[in-house]
Amino acid sequence: MRIGVVGDPDVVVGFRLAGLTDVYEVKSPEQAAKAIEELNSNSEIGLIITTERIGEEIRDTISGVKKVVVEVPDKNGPIVRENDPVKVLVRNAVGVDIK
């Protein structure tokens, strides 16, 4: 199983330095969607990493992907969401609101 990465130049450089080869540097949502589709059609790819911002821009494309997709923060940090599902799960399980 190989890992594919789709991201902006600042994100992909770290993954290239880590030795990943299936890395797509994109500058538009259209390029990102095309790269995600290419990785999804590659049978050797088992995990696709992209940024949260790209994930928000191409949510429909990502929803159709059959592989595991992980969205990581970019250089601007994580996207703050009103109803973060992870926060809700932690609050319900532990009884503590994380900030």
Swiss-Prot record:
One GO cellular component, as annotated: plasma membrane
Entry membrane topology: Peripheral membrane protein
Subunit structure: Has multiple subunits with at least A(3), B(3), C, D, E, F, H, I and proteolipid K(x).
Domain of life: Archaea
Assigned keywords, A-Z: ATP synthesis, Cell membrane, Hydrogen ion transport, Ion transport, Membrane, Transport
Chief location of this protein within or outside the cell: membrane
Pfam entry (one): ATP-synt_F
Stated name of the protein: A-type ATP synthase subunit F
